[in-house]
Amino acid sequence: MISYSPFWRTLRAKNITTYALITRHNISSATIDRIKKGKGITTTKLDDFCRILQCSISDIVEYVPDEK
């Protein structure tokens, strides 16, 4: 499964709020909500986050194997 835990750590490390992403960078609140709920987002949005946060994709998402 894909985890967005790195996304939240990166936001904290860079002192950027979700409000700033929405108001300054035109990220929709629906996209933030999808991330909060662990749902999928597009590769375009992943690219946007990497550009905005000046980070790599591993700072946004990580793969966590299912425990089955």
Where do the protein language model's features map onto the residues?
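Alpha-helical residues within the helix-turn-helix
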Residues: 12, 23, 51
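A short, Lys/Arg-rich alpha-helix, primarily the initiator
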Residues: 1-20
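Short, basic-rich loop-to-helix N-cap that marks the start of a DNA-contacting helix
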Residues: 39-51
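Short C-terminal boundary/hinge segments that cap the last helix of small helical domains
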Residues: 54-68
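Short alpha-helical DNA-recognition segment
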Residues: 15-33
